[in-house]
Amino acid sequence: MAETAYIPRLREVYDRDIRSKLTEQFGLTNVMQVPRLDKVVINMGVGEAVNDRKKVELAAGDLALIAGQKPIVTHSRKAIATFKLREGQAIGAKVTLRKAKMYEFIDRLINVALPRVRDFRGLNPKSFDGRGNYSLGLKEHIVFPEIDYDKSGESWGMDITVCTTAATDEQARALLTAFNFPFRQ
């Protein structure tokens, strides 16, 4: 009895609709030229970690709930006296999502988290890096439903970078628009 593997909803949409639409739109001949999502990197910098090391552990725990996998604690590369920062001190956490977890996270980001952001007017369409990757920042991590604000107690910001295989920003924008990223007009 063969079990069918779980395929995330957005992956099915990409395979069924988006891939053929992008192939037609950009006149691509090779299947491997079609832009696709590569990975999502979520970074959470904890500025208060200079005074209290427990804050990084709390942030890493919340990031694990959001991402669905254990984050890596990031450390400072050099000492900065004005910030009372020593070399090698824990200052944040990051996680890299690929494949199924990446599609699940993007689905939750677009359909659940972004609509819960206060005064949300759409994503900035100029936040592409020139190589087909898109970055956005959230001021509060509590917009994700996995986080209970009463238990978390604090609110940290996070940087989210969506890496694609697109060669240009135009292709990446078309790919993310097809995934229903709410870009500002």
UniProtKB/Swiss-Prot annotation:
Q: Which InterPro entries match?
A: Ribosomal_uL5, Ribosomal_uL5_bac-type, Ribosomal_uL5_C, Ribosomal_uL5_CS, Ribosomal_uL5_dom_sf, Ribosomal_uL5_N
GO MF term list: rRNA binding; structural constituent of ribosome; tRNA binding
What would be one Gene Ontology cellular-component term for the protein? ribosome
Q: Name one GO biological process term.
A: translation
Is Endoplasmic reticulum given among the entry's keywords?
no
Which keywords accompany this UniProt record?
Ribonucleoprotein, Ribosomal protein, RNA-binding, rRNA-binding, tRNA-binding
Keyword Endoplasmic reticulum carried by entry: no
The family assignment reads: Belongs to the universal ribosomal protein uL5 family.
Subunit details: Part of the 50S ribosomal subunit; part of the 5S rRNA/L5/L18/L25 subcomplex. Contacts the 5S rRNA and the P site tRNA. Forms a bridge to the 30S subunit in the 70S ribosome.
Checking NCBIfam families in the record gives: PRK00010.1
PANTHER family reported in the protein's UniProt record: 60S RIBOSOMAL PROTEIN L11-RELATED
Record's function text: This is one of the proteins that bind and probably mediate the attachment of the 5S RNA into the large ribosomal subunit, where it forms part of the central protuberance. In the 70S ribosome it contacts protein S13 of the 30S subunit (bridge B1b), connecting the 2 subunits; this bridge is implicated in subunit movement. Contacts the P site tRNA; the 5S rRNA and some of its associated proteins might help stabilize positioning of ribosome-bound tRNAs.
Q: What is this protein called?
A: Large ribosomal subunit protein uL5
Q: Which organism is it from?
A: Afipia carboxidovorans (strain ATCC 49405 / DSM 1227 / KCTC 32145 / OM5)
Protein encoded by which gene: rplE
